[in-house]
Regions:
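Sequence-level preference for short, compositionally simple segments enriched
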Residues: 1-189
Length: 189
């Protein structure tokens, strides 16, 4: 049996390529980028997940409490870049999920090349990720990652690389030398 073709078809119906973002104050840019590939099944059909894990030689199977299923998931970047992406490049998906895969692969390559550690690289990654899985839910959207309100103005004005509180009442010390009257032209990152 050609497990590769079977898995490609199975993933076309039951799989998901996602990119999630988590705030991490210890990181230079302040956000962690987490690409992952997953396939969910009810517990009574979990055998296919075990065979898939053995076939790819990576990932883990865990319960997903949100929908009471089991999930085969690959999150390790090297496994995604060296095993999962080459597999789906060789065996393209037939549904609109192929477009999501192509964007997912681009995100993984950008992260692998450390682009997520720069403002412009993170913007490109966020743009690609937000164009994937249109029906999916996101905990953090573009506005949360790149706020356009006063927080951006404070970071643009201070420009010394220090993290700032998101509480406007704590900005006084940082803005004491900045006039809030008149117009100021800011160069957005």
């Amino acid at each position: 049996m050609d497990f590769g073709a079977y898995f490609a078809g199975f993933v076309d119906g039951e799989g998901c390529f996602t990119v999630s973002f988590s705030p991490r104050s210890k990181l230079l840019i302040g956000w962690e980028v987490r690409p992952s590939f997953s396939v969910s099944q009810n517990a009574d059909r979990s055998e296919v997940l075990v065979v898939m894990q053995q076939y790819f030689g990576c990932g883990s199977i865990r319960p997903d409490r949100s929908d009471r299923t089991l999930k085969y998931e690959v999150r390790r970047l090297d496994d995604l870049v060296e095993r999962i992406i080459p597999f789906f490049e060789a065996k393209p998906l037939l549904s609109s999920k192929q477009r999501d895969f192509e964007r997912f692969a681009e995100v993984c390559k950008l992260v692998h090349n450390q682009a997520h550690r720069t403002q412009s690289g993170l913007r490109e990654i966020v743009s690609l990720a937000m164009s994937m899985n249109a029906s999916g839910k996101r905990k953090f959207g573009t506005e949360a990652i790149f706020p356009t309100g006063a927080e951006v103005i404070v970071s643009a004005i201070s420009n010394d690389g220090r993290k700032r509180s998101s509480d406007p009442h704590e900005w006084r010390n940082d803005l004491s030398a900045v006039s809030t009257r008149g117009s100021a032209k800011l160069n957005w990152p």
